[in-house]
């Protein structure tokens, strides 16, 4: 019998399972689909400290960036290449320089390496950048990883330590006895365990309800354009200053801002959009046009580059824009790890470590209280 069943084999569930198994916990991971086949597969692979205002999420991001080295070193050699690139990030403004420079100052005070540079220096870093740039901030700690490779490598590490990963298994409910979790009910039968981790991403609210611990997690749709392969033309993760505001916004309406990055395969990824429209997965042409228009405003050469495909996905959004990490006091033995919205790839290592520290009872490496399950925004307490 496993000690813990993790429900959800995306990058957050995989990171939790990997950290738990590294601490000696017997883990089984289940997913109704294929590992990394949901939200994780629709991610860009952002590992960012640059897009977060000072506060708990930035603290988690800084810790997670450091934790990546530890986690990657634990991966089995045959799956260790997850296309990790510590390429750095470049945030640019085309209007008044002061807001971006002021934002960078607050980040530096919070421990982020945020370097204000001149337009000329920005053009040195990115020769094809628009000459309309008025100021820029360089973030050497921003990085990129291939999300599906990362999640599957983390799950491979779990298997290597004796854990189990079961695809195509749908969790229905959590079984309890004498006020504690005793197992997970699935369509394939009951899996007995001492604890359950709800890592269902945008579906975590539904599973939380089924498990007896409802939480307010909503889907937020995002779309990405993918160009045809090109010679290296974008060297860093580049985005406009509006991206920071869009990331932190709770607005349900469509928001778009520009983030452009190349991949090892030579394609260029163009985002990003945010929209709360439930689980409507229809391709919205007007969203794609807006992404393309804004990307050309940052990199004019993209106007002549063909788009090979587009994809989108649903990100788990919490109303106060903070992840939910930790035990559910209403259901002893039920844990949650969700609500990271579009930052889950980058926040996964620290999330897995924090949940594991709380689970095994060692002092956590950062303050877990901002992410607790029983906060008003998550459980609806007024």
Protein language model features and the residues they cover:
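Glycine-rich FAD pyrophosphate-binding loop
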Residues: 22-41
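Short hydrophobic core segments
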Residues: 5-7, 191-203, 207, 352
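Dinucleotide-binding Rossmann-like beta1-alpha1 core, especially the glycine-rich loop
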Residues: 45-125, 295-296
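Short beta-strand to alpha-helix junction loop
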Residues: 59, 91-99, 137-156, 282-287, ...
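Active-site substrate-recognition segment that forms the wall
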Residues: 18-19, 45-46, 80-85, 202-329
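Helical element adjacent to the flavin cofactor pocket in flavoenzyme catalytic cores
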Residues: 137-194
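N-terminal Rossmann-like FAD-binding beta1-loop-alpha1 element of flavoenzymes
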Residues: 3-28
């Amino acid at each position: 019998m496993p000690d813990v069943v993790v429900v959800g084999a995306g990058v957050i569930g995989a990171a939790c399972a990997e950290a738990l198994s590294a601490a000696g916990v017997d883990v089984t991971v289940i997913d109704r689909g294929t590992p990394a086949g949901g939200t994780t597969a629709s991610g860009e692979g952002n590992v960012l400290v640059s897009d977060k205002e000072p506060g708990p999420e930035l603290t988690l991001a800084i810790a997670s960036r450091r934790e990546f080295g530890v986690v990657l070193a634990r991966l089995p050699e045959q799956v260790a290449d997850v296309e990790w690139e510590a390429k750095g990030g470049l945030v640019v403004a085309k209007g008044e320089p002061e807001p971006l420079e002021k934002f960078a100052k607050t980040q530096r005070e919070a421990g982020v390496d945020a370097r204000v540079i001149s337009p000329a220096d920005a053009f040195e870093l990115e020769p094809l950048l628009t000459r309309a740039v008025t100021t820029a901030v360089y973030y050497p700690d921003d990085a990129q990883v291939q999300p599906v490779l990362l999640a599957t490598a983390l799950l491979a590490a779990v298997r290597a330590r004796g854990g189990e990963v079961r695809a195509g298994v749908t969790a229905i409910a959590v079984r309890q006895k004498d006020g504690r979790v005793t197992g997970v009910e699935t369509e394939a039968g009951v899996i007995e365990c001492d604890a359950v981790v709800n890592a269902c991403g945008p579906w975590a609210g539904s599973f939380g309800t089924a498990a007896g611990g409802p939480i307010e997690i909503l889907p937020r749709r995002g779309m990405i354009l993918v160009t045809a392969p090109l010679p290296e033309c974008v060297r860093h993760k580049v985005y406009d200053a509006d991206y920071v505001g869009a990331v932190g916004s709770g607005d349900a309406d469509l928001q778009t801002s520009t983030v452009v990055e190349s991949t090892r395969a030579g394609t260029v990824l163009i985002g990003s959009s945010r929209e709360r429209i439930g689980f409507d997965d229809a391709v919205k042409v007007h969203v794609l046009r807006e992404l393309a228009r804004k990307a050309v405003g940052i990199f004019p050469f993209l106007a002549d580059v063909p788009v090979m495909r587009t994809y989108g996905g649903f990100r788990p959004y919490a109303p106060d824009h903070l992840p939910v990490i930790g035990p559910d006091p209403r259901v002893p033995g039920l844990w949650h790890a969700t609500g990271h919205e579009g930052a889950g790839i980058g926040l996964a290592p620290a999330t897995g470590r924090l949940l594991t520290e709380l689970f095994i009872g060692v002092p956590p490496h950062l303050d877990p209280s901002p992410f607790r399950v029983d906060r008003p925004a998550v459980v609806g307490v007024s």
